[in-house]
Each structure stands twice: as structure tokens, then as C-alpha cells.
Amino acid sequence: QKKDKKDK
């Protein structure tokens, strides 16, 4: 399980 890097 890879967590998407979506932090804005």
C-alpha cells in the first residue's frame, strides 16, 4: 500500500 503524496 503506497500512500499518494498529495499534501497542499
From Swiss-Prot:
Q: Does the keyword Nucleotide-binding apply?
A: no
* A GO cellular-component term linked to this record: extracellular region
Q: Where is the protein localized?
A: Secreted
Superkingdom per UniProt: Eukaryota
Regarding tissue, the record states:
Expressed by the venom gland.
Cysteines paired by S-S bonds: none
Main location as per UniProt: secreted
Asked whether the UniProt record includes Calcium among its keywords, one would answer no
Q: In this chain, where does the modification Pyrrolidone carboxylic acid occur?
A: 1
- Keywords carried by this UniProt record: Pyrrolidone carboxylic acid, Secreted
Its family remark reads: Belongs to the tachykinin family.
Name the record gives this protein: Tachykinin-like peptide-II
Query: Which organism was this protein described from?
Result: Phoneutria nigriventer
